[in-house]
UniProtKB/Swiss-Prot annotation:
Originating species: Caenorhabditis elegans
Positions of the catalytic residues: Y238
Keywords: Membrane, Oxidoreductase, Transmembrane, Transmembrane helix
GO cellular component, one term: membrane
PANTHER family named among the record's database cross-references: RH59310P
Localisation per UniProt entry: Membrane
Membrane topology term: Multi-pass membrane protein
Taxonomic placement: Eukaryota, Metazoa, Ecdysozoa, Nematoda, Chromadorea
Protein name: Uncharacterized oxidoreductase dhs-5
Lineage: superkingdom: Eukaryota
Family recorded in the similarity comment: Belongs to the short-chain dehydrogenases/reductases (SDR) family.
Length: 378
């Protein structure tokens, strides 16, 4: 016997009269919805846009805060970077004669690395850092290679590195300026910054990547800057080169499966380039910075390098440039005023000697009393 087909849906769930009256009522509401409720919907959507925007920025800021707290306060309690794997391989350092580059090298030596290739253009400073490491660690093996990263010819450096078992690389070469000037007002300095911080630092990576991959991979740490996160007026060339290195490093990290690349984007560090001789609330010492930065290896691919700077970077997540510029630019104008006073108004002989030491790495002499120095800094 064939099964009885189910009754029509309308006869069991919705009576015919109810169905007709329901659709009639819905039809009568359509004009009202389009006119009144449609306008209300548009207004609601417009009001939601700033709410979503602010919520998104708060979300980014909150998780950036949690990440910073974890990496620099909680993780050190139980985590240490695995540097033992690089103890018997060479660590190649560019810009390691001053500032962050030098402090980073000393921190690695303190944590057990013993084989270093120091690259820079000042033979005296290279020998000084070499002697300092050997004095603290008698079993250290140090090689030095004199090279100018602004020369444009990397053939000699490429040949020198090609036969080395490279396991760790610190790319901290860089140059900066004192004055805040528009791009093009001082073309010699602009060109030098682009040549050293941009092409020089990038070409150096192309020299170390093949031998490192051939040896089984390794770790690269590149010093960029927080000034490469947002475009900053009067620092166009410097910001552009730091943004270049940040994006280049992120791309390289995804291209080479056996090579880990970490990018450091610090704020102000007490180095010769910034004319700070000691740390403060917002300025950290190179030693403190590098101690925290080395500890973050293996935890993050991009970081400001220390808790102090990570907290400062929260402003980049929270505020758009229309607001952020009123917070950032006064800092740079104050820095320019401070450096100008150091150069022009000091009558203290000891301070004059200090300034002479700061400027001994002059790259491009100019008629504007601005000095470009080789150093490793933000």
């Amino acid at each position: 016997m064939a099964p009885t087909p189910p009754p029509p849906l309308s006869s069991t769930l919705i009576p015919e009269e109810s169905s007709t009256s329901f659709f009639a009522s819905l039809h009568s509401l359509l004009p009202t919805f389009h006119v009144e409720n449609g306008a209300q919907l548009a207004v609601t959507m417009l009001l939601l846009i700033p709410v979503v925007y602010v919520g998104y920025r708060l979300y980014r800021t909150f998780f950036a805060f949690l990440k910073a707290i974890f990496i620099y306060t909680i993780a050190p309690l139980f985590y240490k970077p695995n540097l033992e794997q690089y103890q018997h391989r060479w660590t190649v350092v560019s810009g390691g004669t001053d500032g962050i580059g030098k402090a980073y090298t000393l921190e690695l030596a303190k944590r057990g690395l013993r084989k270093f290739v120091l690259i820079g253009r000042n033979p005296k400073k290279l020998d000084s850092v070499k002697s300092e490491i050997e004095e603290k660690h008698s079993d250290a093996q140090i090689k030095t290679f004199v090279f100018d990263f602004g020369s444009g010819d990397f053939s000699s450096l490429r040949d020198y590195i090609s036969d080395i078992d490279v396991g760790f690389v610190v790319n901290s070469v860089g140059t900066g300026r004192d004055n805040l000037e528009r791009y093009g007002d001082n073309p010699d300095e602009d060109t030098q910054i682009l040549r050293v911080n941009g092409m020089g630092a990038a070409e150096f990576l192309s020299c170390v990547l093949p031998p490192m991959e051939k040896s089984g991979g390794g770790q690269i740490v590149v010093l960029s800057s927080s000034q490469g996160v947002r475009p900053i007026p009067m620092l166009a060339a410097y910001c552009a080169t730091k943004a270049l290195m940040t994006f280049l490093c992120e791309s390289i990290d995804r291209e080479y499966s056996t090579i880990n690349v970490q990018t450091l984007i610090p704020a102000l560090v007490a180095t010769k380039m910034t004319y700070y001789t000691k740390g403060s609330t917002f300025v950290v010492t190179p030693e403190n910075f590098c101690h925290q930065a080395v500890g973050s290896i293996g935890l993050t691919k991009k970081t400001a390098g220390c808790l102090n700077h990570e907290l400062q970077m929260l402003g980049f997540h929270l505020f758009p440039w229309t607001i952020l510029k009123y917070l950032i630019m006064p800092i740079y104008y104050h820095q320019r005023k401070r450096v100008t006073e150091l150069h022009n108004t000091s009558n203290n002989p000891e301070q004059e000697i200090s300034l002479q030491e700061l400027n001994e790495e002059t790259v491009v002499p100019t008629t504007k009393k601005t000095v470009t120095r080789d150093s490793a800094t933000a």
